[in-house]
Amino acid sequence: MEYNYPKFTPEMKKTHTILIPNMAITQFRLLEYALRYDGYKCEILGNCGSAVAQLGLKYVHNDTCYPALLVIGQLLDAIESGKYDIHKVALILPQTGGGCRASNYIHLLRKALVKAGYPNIPVASLNFSGLEKDSGFQMTLPLARRAIASVFYGDMLCALRNQVAPYENEKGAADKMVDLWVERLGRVLLAGKGFTSREMKHTFPLIARDFKSIPVTRVPKVKVGVVGEIYVKYSPLGNNDLQKFLESQDCEVNFPGLMGFVQYCIFNMGEDHVLYGGKLAMKMGTDQLLNWLDSVERSMLKAEADAGFYAPGPFKELVEKPEGIISLGAKMGEGWLLTAEMIELVQGGYGNIVCAQPFGCLPNHIVGKGMVNKIRAMYPSANITPIDYDPSATRVNQENRIKLMLAVAKERLNAPAEAKPLTAEEIAGGAPSLSHA
């Protein structure tokens, strides 16, 4: 028997507070302002701890993806905290619309709400693919533009903060600068400004200039890149505060931006036409959108580089990275993007990589862990460690595995190997691989 779950209606926009599970903290802080400008009352959740995972396990099958356990557990924990009026609260979950099980989280959440005794709490879907067309929450074009601006600004703030914080003379200066700019950009977004390409291109150099002004002392440090399943990659709840741990080990950390994943999802819609046929209008539309995003992204990266910071290549160059390694048709979960990000990190000097993945995430095991040996063969300096996250995995074991990777990185710090790919003849002759160590 099919249960008639409550829908989020347009009328609830004025009466209900929408709770949003946290993931990429800075980007989501700005996204909250974009939603508030559009008339939504919302709150990004910050509740963490083992109780969240245990609550998720109570209402969701333990074989379900780890991110689903955490997201549903976090939302239920917030509801049961007593902080919110359960008759005036709604929940929201992002959906990519792809083949990954993440597209089904929303149905698992609705079932969990019924089991937990909250059958009347509505759940809305945040997506760009037209799922749940009858929902009162719709991703309109103006809201989408403000959301995109929030991601661009958040990516830049995170990238610059992570390159300044390990070297700052006054501890906490980079974090204060992030807070300052989030507040400043939040006011701009609430005023209905700051989201056009012209405004973003004007703002990027100002952000870079302020971070450049922070006094630092540059000393050699281990540089670590983080890739993986999108939730576990960014969420401190999902990866046991991985960034904080790496920084406690005196590392500079690089998280490839969230906008790369957004562009990856858009690119895949057009790539489907190339691989399988279909409507040419879809391909033309996605190409046009990607061109617009590319223009903004290049301005952001130029502002970073002009201020003396490391800036990766734009998405259009990232698409070329996995050529000869994995097909662009591999697009379940993070797909070819994860492989491309690892190559980009190695080439950019972040050859020590943590690949964070949920234990049962099949796409990640293929495009992440499955590509490690091939990348090591091409780039012998690559020092990649896949780390599994699930309710039964202990934080101590995860951190000990990372420490082993960092021990190798610290040995190489004084005598770094150039991230130079081997020739085809060298690869054919048997490239070095740590899998045989």
Residue ranges and their predicted role:
Residues 1-437:
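An N-terminal assembly and electron-transfer interface module characteristic of large anaerobic redox
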